[in-house]
């Protein structure tokens, strides 16, 4: 069986690298990014320059006060300077508005690319990956994690760059105005950075835990919703609530701590900044009183000193979004970096003709070999996880057109064998051949195209009945889909649906009975019409009357095809050419029905009721 699901979370190995990787996606909108960059520089120049322009205004006013004659202040000069200051502030606001609008477009375009690449990559992942991940954890990557990246790009990234530009501009101006006062500001800034950094590490840790716990909680909710019928049947509502409360409490605890430390950054940094500002005002005032600093420079420096810490405060206030986004991005990229399903096959599948004239061929270089459907296992050993072998030295041979049945208790290895035929997993020892060709040499897409499966858990998509049948072969015509439905004995119930074949199915076919869903799955396999069929407990959920009703159609469907059948009901395998009885991953008996009954072994006990499949 699959390995245990992952329940822990990993810290981002390199937050800077993760942020840089996000910027690589954003960089695909380079012209818009250039526009944002220009607007950020322009807004910084305007806002920083506006404060500096206060210096000549204040000095002129101070000179007039000292002279005792306000008329000495030129009205035109004063109005001109005030107009320049107003224009600079208006220009800064306009530039910020433009870059904000453009950055929103960049953010949505970037996250759209990330989601697309993530979904595309998911299609290439091996089943082993999904065995170790809950659906909730995977969905959390597409929703919460990517949404947090979008918020960071739309708000925090712009704030980060803008604050950096503003900080540099203010530093240059402060040094030019008064180096001694700047040194005081620098000391308090260093104290603030060290303090905020320590708080930020705590916040980052809890945000990572918050994201991981959210994924686990989503998985628990999804599992509970899907299994609600089972929960109610066994009266396990209290246990379900208790289980959810554990996940919910873990999420609450992590989220509370994360936001506590993130919220602590602002007040702490403000307190340190205000202390520094007071000291600068005191020292600067003394310099002004002693005549070593003019009044315009003093008040302009105070203005910059107040602004000096704003970029740092703004970054600190955005740490909530930044840490949450980086933690989520790490999870997204972790999934993106998961190795794709390996496929070194070179043999391809070629199909010619249609209908009765359809022919299947293996194309091995220049050699074309007809597909017969002969499958052989030769001393196959397999384990989902290295420490637990689930199939031991399995050897079997299915000739063209034969029906091979697997019988055994749950966990005996029946479904695992069919998974290996499809190469959903690779074996550790032995070989599996298809028409004498090692399946490792066949391209996986072509190998699976030559097979059709009716899975134990029938899955239908939110689409019409017709499109769900057509999923077996996307180029199938409506007529071929209807013919397949008739073959599977699904046509009669489909006609009684409100819109017939155009009836829209709800999630996973929830508006159909289990038997009807199973019939559609069989019709889907029928429209594919490949040389090999795998029926994994295909009729276990269909009532006896329905099962008898489709037997004739299934016999016609399997005619001339190699078929592997797993069924709970032994009546469905009696006509098989060979029956393999499995126990603990080993074939303990093999032969047709009559031969196995004559042996009076395990199969005989199952058929006579002396033993059960459970």
Task: Give residue spans per PLM region.
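ABC-type nucleotide-binding domain
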Residues: 352-614
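Transmembrane helices of ABC transporter permease
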Residues: 28, 32-45, 85, 91, ...
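Membrane-integrated ABC transporters
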Residues: 1-47, 62-84, 99-103, 107, ...
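Short intracellular "coupling" helices and adjacent cytoplasmic loop segments at the cytosolic face
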Residues: 2-10, 108, 116-140, 144-148, ...
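An intracellular "coupling" helix at the cytosolic face of ABC transporter transmembrane type-1 domains
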Residues: 127-128, 144-153, 157, 161, ...
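Helix-loop-helix
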Residues: 64-65, 173-187, 257-330, 335-339
């Amino acid at each position: 069986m699959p390995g245990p699901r992952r329940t822990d979370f990993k810290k981002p190995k390199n937050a800077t690298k993760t942020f840089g990787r996000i910027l690589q996606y954003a960089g695909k909108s380079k012209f818009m990014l250039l526009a944002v960059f220009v607007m950020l520089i322009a807004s910084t120049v305007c806002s920083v320059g506006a404060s500096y322009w206060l210096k000549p205004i204040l000095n002129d006013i101070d000179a007039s006060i000292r002279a005792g004659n306000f008329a000495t202040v030129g009205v035109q000069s004063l109005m001109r300077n005030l107009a320049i200051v107003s224009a600079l502030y208006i220009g800064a606001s306009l530039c910020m508005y433009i870059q904000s609008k453009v950055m929103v477009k960049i953010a949505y375009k970037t996250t759209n690319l990330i989601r697309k690449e993530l979904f595309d990559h998911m299609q290439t992942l091996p089943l082993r990956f999904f065995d170790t991940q809950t659906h909730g954890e995977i969905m959390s990557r597409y929703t919460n994690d990517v949404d947090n990246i979008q918020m960071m790009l739309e708000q925090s990234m712009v704030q980060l760059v803008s604050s950096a530009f503003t900080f540099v501009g203010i530093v240059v101006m402060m040094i030019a105005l008064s180096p001694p006062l700047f040194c005081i500001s620098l000391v308090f800034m260093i104290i603030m950075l060290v303090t905020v950094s320590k708080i930020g590490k705590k916040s980052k840790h809890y945000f990572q835990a918050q994201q991981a716990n959210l994924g686990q909680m989503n998985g628990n909710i999804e599992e509970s919703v899907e299994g609600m019928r089972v929960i109610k049947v066994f009266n396990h509502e209290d246990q379900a609530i208790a289980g959810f409360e554990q996940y919910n409490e873990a999420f609450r605890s992590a989220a509370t701590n994360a936001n506590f430390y993130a919220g602590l950054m602002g007040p702490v940094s403000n307190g340190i900044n205000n202390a520094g500002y007071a000291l600068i005002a005191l020292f600067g005032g003394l310099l002004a009183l002693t005549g070593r600093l003019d009044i315009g420079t003093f008040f302009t420096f105070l203005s910059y000193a107040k602004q000096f810490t704003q970029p740092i405060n703004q970054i600190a206030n955005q740490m909530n979004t930044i840490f949450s986004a980086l933690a989520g991005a790490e999870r997204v990229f972790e999934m993106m970096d998961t190795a794709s399903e390996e496929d070194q096959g070179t043999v391809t599948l070629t199909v010619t003709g249609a209908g009765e004239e359809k022919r299947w061929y293996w194309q091995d270089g220049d050699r074309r070999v007809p597909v017969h459907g002969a499958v052989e296992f030769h001393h196959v050993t397999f384990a989902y996880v290295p420490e637990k072998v689930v199939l031991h030295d399995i050897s079997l041979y299915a000739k063209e057109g034969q029906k091979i049945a697997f019988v055994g208790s749950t966990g005996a290895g029946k479904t695992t064998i069919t998974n290996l035929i499809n190469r959903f997993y690779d074996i550790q020892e032995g070989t599996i051949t298809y028409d004498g060709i090692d399946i490792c040499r066949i391209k996986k897409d072509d190998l699976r195209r030559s097979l059709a499966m009716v899975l134990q858990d029938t899955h239908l998509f939110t689409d019409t009945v017709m499109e769900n049948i057509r999923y077996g072969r996307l180029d199938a015509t409506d007529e071929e889909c209807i013919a397949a439905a008739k073959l599977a004995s699904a046509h009669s119930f489909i006609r009684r649906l409100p819109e017939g074949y155009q009836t829209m199915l709800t999630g996973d076919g929830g508006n159909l009975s289990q038997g009807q869903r199973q019939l559609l799955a069989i019709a889907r396999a029928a429209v594919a019409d490949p040389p090999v069929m795998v029926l994994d407990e295909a009729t276990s959920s269909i009532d006896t009357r329905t099962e008898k009703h489709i037997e004739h159609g299934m016999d016609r469907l399997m005619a001339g095809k190699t078929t592997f059948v797993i069924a709970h009901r032994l009546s469905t395998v009696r006509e098989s050419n060979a029956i393999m009885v499995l126990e603990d991953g080993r074939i303990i008996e093999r032969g047709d029905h009559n031969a196995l009954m004559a042996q009076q072994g395990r199969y005989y006990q199952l058929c006579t009721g002396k033993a059960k499949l459970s």
